């Protein structure tokens, strides 16, 4: 009796697509890890070898992963060195409007509740920059705190709140650090990866921290929830 030929086992379409999807996901993850390694490197332009060590891959793998990142302008190569590309600026330009839009409802409610100018402030290097500001509608006067206002992270409630540790109280108050006679209370926006920001209020009248502090902290939490 003749032996039957052994049929090769051919993966099903579902198995093949699942494997391909898993491989694509791993490649994407490694590509993002590589981009992060370039951004986090101690030097301005890390080498291929340094990046390979940073992400636990071979030099050949790093070269392959760099190709799509270069094509999209996210990185640029200078010989064996790699720098961040200008394409990241185009992506970054889309972030601020989205942050502002997500924060506006919470800021509006905070400003109306406290009767003070409410703001969302983000860290930009060693400075704090206001990217969204809402003024109360019913007060006679209020602090003119404008979008784009910058100051040191070490001055004012907005900047100092960004650096608050998780184990510290949820808000911080300052007086006269940015404008003479102006008082501010701010709380950090926590739980949003990659975002260093705070929500706060600033006014010329005295603020009761026991009353306003929890409101500011709740607004910061609402902003974080809107961004997740």
State the predicted function of each range.
Residues 167-228:
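Extended hydrophobic
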Residues 74-77, 120-121, 189:
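A structural signal for short hydrophobic beta-strand segments in well-ordered beta-sheet cores
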